[in-house]
Amino acid sequence: MIDTWSQFKKARIFDLSQPMFRGMPQSPNHTPFRMVLDRRHGDILSSEGDSASNEIVVTGCHVGTHIDALSHVSFKGKLYGDIDANSVMSHTGFSALGIETVASFLCRGVLLDVAKFHGVKILPADYEITVSDLEGTLKAAQTQINEGDVVLISSGWDHNWSEKELFQGQLHGAPGIGEAGAIWLAAHKPRACGSETIAFEHIPSGLGHRKLPVHRVFLVENGIHIIETMKLRELVQSGVVEFLFVLSPLNLVGATGSPVRPLAVLV
């Protein structure tokens, strides 16, 4: 145990989350992030002069860096495990497959830098990451994907974070894997996959977020969680391929997702 603690004292930690603020880039399909002070310093004072401030936050659970629960997407009325969506859904949330059922992550993470594989800083907005791209990137990284891993796919898209319309991909699309790439990844049985973009998967130019086949393949057909809007730039720049991945969703009973602050740890 002593040796373990001494190793962690030297650990390097990468924060893989984007900051949350009013007006941040996000999917147009979800309630925007808003935060206001509910009580300001000086509104209420104790007899000794003490004061406190607090806020109210309103946001969709799929805004900012977040993870999808398996209740997030259905196909022809069915959720993962052939569960009828209507039978477990109410105005208060889901009685099955909610985010509270997702255990914390403490596992091996694998980074696939597809932009580097192509020799570019950022993949084009309308680029679909193919099976050949994934295979080539994995081979170049001299690693493998094991069952239960978390696989992070970098397109360099977080370099566009400050350009809201471009980052959201509404007009020009966003890079990501397509259905074929999702099927290939699912065959390796990762516990979750993530990327820098809002939707994780390829968004064709001009189509917006209307068609998301990768969500069906992962969430409905294979029970693989999706982590979106990640900040991977520093991890990519470090040159690491394998790392300890840490993530814990909020314990929101019946919710279809949760904001998260994932970490990559090098020991």
List each language-model region with its residue ranges.
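Active-/binding-site microenvironments in catalytic and ligand-binding cores
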Residues: M1-V267
